Amino acid sequence: MENNPIAFLILAILGASLGSFCMSLTMRFCENKPLLSLRSYCFSCYQKLKPLELIPIFSYIFLRFKCKTCHIKIPFSVFLAEVLGMIFAWIAYLLSQNIGEFIHLLIFLFVLFALSCIDLKFQAVPQKLLWLIFFIAFSFAFNSNEFAYFFIFENFQNGFMVQAFIFAGFLFLLKNFIAFLKNFRTKDIQENLGDADIIILASMAGVFGFKSAFIILFLASLLSLPFFIHNKNTKLAFLPFINAAFVIYLIYLIVRELI
């Protein structure tokens, strides 16, 4: 896709808007509020936001990080989501060959971000969003010939289904083996990788391949290591680290193409 300043400016506006919208939906989900039935509002005083207060990034700065009505500090996560939204839009644009790839990758990034935020708060994710991200990846890499051969168990081809299922099986065995080693002398049942992590990594393997998914898993483990060492007795949400590792890997792919 063509690279020019106007395109990147439009992408910045689109990404920041989607980031703000994504964070709003995530916060409503975490607060058990209606997702789409209400206009945007302050989560402290519940005052509906005016149009100028909805402008991504600039409204956060002009309001001096506080609600105009109740003066309660606006969560930094809102601003961060808008900035990350711009980055997601640029990444999706630079890695896409056509509009279809751009839409798939952009939705994948934002749904993964929403899942990461929810995982941070609840250390659990909704099944609907989890399987949505898998089917987004599936629809992106879908091949009718591969699909047919996979279900008749003949002539397996190196496509989404094979890569996703092999990596899911690999993670399942790895997860249980680590749990076995960790709990060898105890009767505690603890798991290191959750089912959500396996499904998301399997979807990445289906699109980018086994090796790429393994690199993302390895990088996520490295990123989580300092937090794990610092908070040994605290249960750690791993999905945000997978998200960060995935974004880093995509940036690496962009840099590799530019060099």
Give names to the regions the model predicted.
Residues M1-I259:
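A membrane-topology feature that recognizes alpha-helical transmembrane segments
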